[in-house]
Amino acid sequence: MALIKEPLKPTGALDEFRSFDVTPIIGTEFPDASLKAWLEDPKADDLLRELAITVSRRGVVFFRRQDGLTEEMQKAIVQKLGVLSGKPATSSLHRHAHQPDPNADPEILWINSEENKKLLAGTPFDPALPARQSCRGLWHNDISYEPNPSDYALLRITQPPALVVADLPAIDTLWASGYEVFDRISRPIQKFLETLTATFGELRERDGSDPKFQVPRGSPANVGTNLRPTHPVIRTNPVTGWKSVYAVGLHVQTINGLASDESDGLKKWFTKLIVENHDLQVRFRWNNANDVAIWDNRCTYHTATYDHEGYGIREGYRACGVGEKPYLDPNSTGRREAR
C-alpha cells in the first residue's frame, strides 16, 4: 500500500567521492570531501539531496577538516538538506531559546564544555558528581521537546580539547540507530508500541516572559513556553519510509496511557537496548579542528563522552533544522523488512 510520503531513492550522485561505512548498521564517512565545495558546486542541489538521503539511511555522516566552512554555510547546508528532501515549506532552522551567548546568532547553537557544565549542574547528569556511575540518561535526539522537532543537524567542532591535540582520544560522540532498536523488538511488541504516544519536555522550566519564546523557533508550531508536545513512540522517517523508536532519551517525560511504573519500565528498556547493543552504535572521534558530523534526529540518538576534565575546553557550533510534525505511517516498515 502507498505511504503517506514516497521515500526518496539514492541516485549515486556522491559515488565519485571516496566514502566508507564506519559500521554495518550506522555511520558513513567521507574522508576527503569538502562540504564547502559541494555547497558551491553547480550541481549543489543534486549533491545535497543525495547527502540528505545518505544521512537518513545511514543515520550519521562524518567529514574531516572542513576548514573554510562558516556558520552561514552550516545553516545553508542544513536548510537545503531539509528542503531538498521534502520538509514543510514553513520549516526553517531552529532558534535556540537558551543560547548561552545572548549576542550570538540564534540559529547557531554554541557548544562549549564549560557552559554545558552549567546546564547540567544540579541534574542527575552533573559531571561534578563525585560518584557518577552512569551516563545512560544523556542519550537524546535534538529538540524533541518542540511540536515540530529536528530533521537534520550539523555539528562542527572548532576546538577539540588538549587531549585530542596531543593525539589521545577524548570526548568522542556516540550515535545509535533508532531503526535498529525498532528491528530488535519482537513483532507483537512492535505492534503494541505503534499504538502509543509519549509526552516530551525539557529538563528545566522556562520563563514565560522571555521574548525569545514568543517568536517561531523554526516553525509556526514552535512558539511559546509550553514545551510538552505529544509524539508517537514509533515514528516513520519520510525520507526512507522506515520506522524507528523515537521516544528515547532525556526529553521523554512519560509514555501516555500507561501506569507510571509501566512508562518508566519502557523508557528504561529502550535505553537498555541501546547501551547493551554496541553494534547499533557508532563512536566518532573528533580528531581535528573543523571535523563535522551530520545526523538525522528522526532516526538516531546521540550522547557526548565526558572524559576530558582538566584538558581544556571543547567548543563547536551546531545548526539544527526543523522538520515535520512526527507521525507514524501504518504502511511503513522497519529497515530490515524494507531491505
From Swiss-Prot:
List the EC numbers from the record.
Answer: 1.14.11.-
Locate the residues binding Fe cation: 140, 142, 302
**GO molecular function: any one?**
2-oxoglutarate-dependent dioxygenase activity
Residues where substrate binds: 96, 318
Region annotated Disordered sits at 207-230
What pathway annotation does it carry?
Secondary metabolite biosynthesis; terpenoid biosynthesis
Which free-text remark accompanies the cofactor? Answer: Binds 1 Fe(2+) ion per subunit.
- Gene Ontology CC terms: cytoplasm
The first-level EC class reads oxidoreductase
Q: Which residues bind 2-oxoglutarate?
A: 173, 314, 318
Write one Pfam family the protein is assigned to: TauD
Q: Which is a GO BP term held by this UniProt record?
A: terpenoid biosynthetic process
Q: Does the keyword Iron apply?
A: yes
Q: Does the keyword Metal-binding apply?
A: yes
Q: Which Gene3D superfamilies match?
A: Clavaminate synthase-like
Which coenzymes or cofactors are required? Fe(2+)
Give the keywords, sorted: Dioxygenase, Iron, Metal-binding, Oxidoreductase
Main function: Alpha-ketoglutarate-dependent dioxygenase; part of the gene cluster that mediates the biosynthesis of betaestacins. The bifunctional terpene synthase btcA converts isopentenyl diphosphate (IPP) and dimethylallyl diphosphate (DMAPP) into the sesterterpene betaestacin I. The C-terminal prenyltransferase (PT) domain of btcA catalyzes formation of GFPP, whereas the N-terminal terpene cyclase (TC) domain catalyzes the cyclization of GFPP into betaestacin I. The cytochrome P450 monooxygenase btcB is then responsible for the six-step oxidation of betaestacin I to yield betaestacin II.
Q: Which family does it belong to?
A: Belongs to the TfdA dioxygenase family.
Name the chain's protein: Alpha-ketoglutarate-dependent dioxygenase btcD
The scientific name of the source species is: Neocamarosporium betae (Beet black rot fungus)
